């Protein structure tokens, strides 16, 4: 009976509260795991979240290429994965692509 009362109170608190728990929130890259960086959220202004490094075809920013970056990032995208390059495409956008200079033909 006590357990049921506790669960009821917890559910009541969850439904009444005006907050959310955000996992993956960060301030700097060193707080994120391998293969991620601390980028600005597109949805919540002022929030930074651990975000995966850019894969081939994903948007990137040419000035954002260091991981870890020891200050606060100013972009919503992470640098590309180590084997990729942030390249400008004909449509004017920057995307992660293969570094053709390092391929042996």
UniProtKB/Swiss-Prot annotation:
InterPro entries on file: Prokineticin, Prokineticin_domain
Gene Ontology molecular functions: growth factor activity
Disulfide bonds: 26-38, 32-50, 37-78, 60-86, 80-96
Compartments where located: Secreted
Tissue: Localizes to glandular epithelium, stroma and vascular epithelial cells of first trimester decidua (at protein level). Up-regulated in first trimester decidua when compared with non-pregnant endometrium. Expressed in the steroidogenic glands, ovary, testis, adrenal and placenta.
GO biological process, one term: angiogenesis
Signal peptide positions (record): 1-19
Listed transmembrane segments: none
Cellular component annotations (GO), alphabetically ordered: extracellular region
Keyword presence, Ion transport: no
Keywords annotated in UniProt: Angiogenesis, Disulfide bond, Growth factor, Mitogen, Secreted, Signal
Family: Belongs to the AVIT (prokineticin) family.
UniProt function note: Potently contracts gastrointestinal (GI) smooth muscle. Induces proliferation, migration and fenestration (the formation of membrane discontinuities) in capillary endothelial cells derived from endocrine glands. Has little or no effect on a variety of other endothelial and non-endothelial cell types. Induces proliferation and differentiation, but not migration, of enteric neural crest cells. Directly influences neuroblastoma progression by promoting the proliferation and migration of neuroblastoma cells. Positively regulates PTGS2 expression and prostaglandin synthesis.
PANTHER family linked to this entry: PROKINETICIN, PROKINETICIN-1
Descriptive protein name: Prokineticin-1
Organism name: Homo sapiens (Human)
